[in-house]
Amino acid sequence: EFYVKTPEELRDSFKWLDAETFNECIKNTVEIAEKCHLILELGKSPLPNYPIPEGYSTESYLQHLVYEGLKKRYKEITPDLKERVDYELGVINQMGFAAYFLITWDFIHYAKTHNIPVGPGRGSAAGSVVAYALEITDLDPIRHKLLFERFLNPERFTMPDIDIDFCIEKREQVIDYVTNKYGEDKVCQII
C-alpha cells in the first residue's frame, strides 16, 4: 500500500489503539515530520565546496593536479595517455564531479602526508587514470587494461563510488580532518 492514507484509513489501520494513543501517535508523527527539513535542488551538487586556489576554476585545478600526478606516475605522457586522461576529465566535468575528486584527493592526501596507511583502492574506481594520477588509487589502469566506463559512465548518471580503506587505528583522525574542514553537516561514514 504505497500511498498516503486518508485520516479515516489511518484510523481504521490502527483501530486496535485507543483514541488517546492514536492521537498521540499522529501528534508525534507530525512533530517528527516538522523537524525534518530536506530540500533537494535538482541539478545542484550536494557536495561541500573545495577551496580552489586563486586563478583556477574547480575543473582547471583538478586538471592541474591530474597532470602533475601523471608526471609522477608515468615516465612519459604519451598521446594515448593524454587522450584517455582528457576523456576522463571531460566525463568528470560534464557530470559535475570535479569537486568530488578534489575533496577525495584532499583527504587521501591528508592521510598519506600524516602517515595514515591508505588502501590501494578497490572496485571500479581502479579503472580511472584520473584517480590513479591523484593517488586516490594505486593500481595503474593502463597497465592492467581497466575500463573507466565501469566506474563512471555519462549514460548512467550516478555519483562516483570510490571505496577507500584507512588504517583502523587512525581512521578517526581522517574523519576528524574531513569533518573540521568541510563541516559536520557535510560528512557521514558509510561502513
Predicted segments, located by residue:
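Phosphodiester-processing cores and adjacent nucleic acid-binding clamps
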Residues: 1-191
